[in-house]
């Protein structure tokens, strides 16, 4: 609590009707004779308790708008309140700016690794090749060999026993039934026909020369038939 305050019992009147409060400290000895009087005003002025320098309005009365060392009235209270609110607003603004800066820095820290990953160039030899699906990356990479299950091989052998050449529609049906691609069915049948030709040629050579000629003619017919079938599929 401040030691300076306005005491109505210590005011004195001037000729113009204005009250003038002398700037005297609370612990001053000049207040001691006046503290026990109930009256104030003209009687206090007649007693002349204070010396003449304290009655000079030019020296003691503050007319400027700036706050003096003893200006503790209502205006100063509101000024302090406004200053306190401004300080709080500045503090809140500083806190929000700090939080925004932290969020921005964290976002930059997150996006930096992603940018680094995107900027890394991946070459074909760095990618992994799937040997089971037969899908490889790069033109110079050798495709992996497809591994067929026992059930798939059995169904394909049955189909090959009845039809050595498949139409596109039948190939799609078998691929959907065996969970394979159309290309895998086509490659399997091509390989199976080549194997069948070799087996037929081998049996013909073992049986005799005449049989070998007939086997060769049959092999040539099979090759021509295969070529025509592939041309039809391309069309």
Swiss-Prot record:
InterPro entries: Antp_homeobox, HD, HD_metazoa, Homeobox_Antennapedia_CS, Homeobox_CS, Homeodomain-like_sf. Sequence-specific transcription factor which is part of a developmental regulatory system that provides cells with specific positional identities on the anterior-posterior axis. Residues 219-235 have a biased composition (Basic and acidic residues). Gene3D superfamilies: Homeodomain-like. The gene is HOXC6. GO terms for molecular function: DNA-binding transcription factor activity, RNA polymerase II-specific; RNA polymerase II cis-regulatory region sequence-specific DNA binding. Residues 200-235 are annotated as: Disordered. Keywords: Developmental protein, DNA-binding, Homeobox, Nucleus, Transcription, Transcription regulation. A motif (Antp-type hexapeptide) lies at residues 122-127. Belongs to the Antp homeobox family. This is Homeobox protein Hox-C6.
């Amino acid at each position: 609590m401040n030691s300076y305050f306005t005491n109505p019992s210590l005011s004195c009147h001037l000729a113009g009707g204005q009250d003038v409060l002398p700037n005297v400290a609370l612990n001053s000895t000049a207040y001691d004779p006046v503290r026990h009087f109930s009256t104030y005003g003209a009687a206090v002025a007649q007693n002349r308790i204070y010396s003449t320098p304290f009655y000079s309005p030019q020296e003691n009365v503050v007319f400027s708008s700036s706050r003096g060392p003893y200006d503790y009235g209502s205006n100063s209270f509101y000024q302090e309140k406004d200053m306190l609110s401004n300080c709080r607003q500045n503090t809140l603004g500083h806190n929000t700016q700090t939080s925004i800066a932290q969020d921005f820095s964290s976002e930059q820290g997150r996006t930096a690794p992603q940018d680094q990953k995107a900027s890394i160039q991946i070459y074909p030899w760095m990618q992994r090749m799937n040997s089971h699906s037969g899908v490889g990356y790069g033109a110079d990479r050798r495709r992996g060999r497809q591994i067929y299950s026992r059930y798939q091989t059995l169904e394909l052998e049955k189909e090959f026993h009845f039809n050595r050449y498949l139409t596109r529609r039948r190939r799609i049906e078998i691929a959907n039934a065996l969970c394979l691609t159309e290309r895998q069915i086509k490659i399997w049948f091509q390989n199976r026909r080549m194997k069948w030709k070799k087996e037929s040629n081998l049996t013909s050579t073992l049986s005799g020369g005449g049989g070998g000629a007939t086997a060769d003619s049959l092999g040539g017919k099979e090759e021509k038939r295969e070529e025509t079938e592939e041309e039809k599929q391309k069309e």
